[in-house]
Amino acid sequence: MKAKHQRLILAVAALCGVAGAGVLAASALRDEAAYFRTPVEIAGGKAAVGEAMRLGGMVAKGSIVRQADGLTIRFVATDGQASVPVEYTGIVPDLFGEESGMIADGRMRADGTFVADRILAKHDERYMPPQMGEMPKNMKAAVEG
């Protein structure tokens, strides 16, 4: 075989390998991909029952209700224009609380309740972990970059 043909075969094999890796990566991410929805979008009918999505908003004041099992909580997510009831079973993040930002991964139920599989608590850019409160200011600057 000539060197030109060997290079062509090598290039085609490399291209097939890259394409195969891309297909595998895309199929792996398909299950993880979820649309981000706000309560007003969900109230407007943009969320189908059973569709995997992320719900973002604020936890409404006075809406957190803990169930007797100690793990299940119910609360209302709001964006100031609409509200969505949320149910979650698991341990909530330390920063989760009333009037705090949150993002929940899950699905809508037919009764209009968002059933979350995971909850992330959002914080503003001024948040500082309690452990950093004890550090001298020059060390904080070095850690923060």
From Swiss-Prot:
Classification of source organism: Bacteria, Pseudomonadati, Pseudomonadota, Alphaproteobacteria, Sphingomonadales
UniProt topology in membrane: Single-pass type II membrane protein
One matching Pfam family: CcmE
Keyword Ribosomal protein assigned: no
Family to which this protein belongs: Belongs to the CcmE/CycJ family.
Residues on Periplasmic side: 29-145
Positions with a binding annotation for heme: H123, Y127
SUPFAM superfamilies reported in the protein's UniProt record: Heme chaperone CcmE
Membrane spanning residue stretches: 8-28
Predominant subcellular localization, coarse grouping: membrane
A GO BP annotation: cytochrome complex assembly
Gene3D superfamilies xrefs: Nucleic acid-binding proteins (2.40.50.140)
Function: Heme chaperone required for the biogenesis of c-type cytochromes. Transiently binds heme delivered by CcmC and transfers the heme to apo-cytochromes in a process facilitated by CcmF and CcmH.
Membrane side Cytoplasmic: residue ranges: 1-7
One cellular-component annotation, GO: plasma membrane
A Gene Ontology molecular function term of the record: heme binding
Subcellular location: Cell inner membrane
UniProt keyword annotations, A-Z: Cell inner membrane, Cell membrane, Cytochrome c-type biogenesis, Heme, Iron, Membrane, Metal-binding, Signal-anchor, Transmembrane, Transmembrane helix
Protein's recorded name: Cytochrome c-type biogenesis protein CcmE
Organism: Sphingopyxis alaskensis (strain DSM 13593 / LMG 18877 / RB2256)
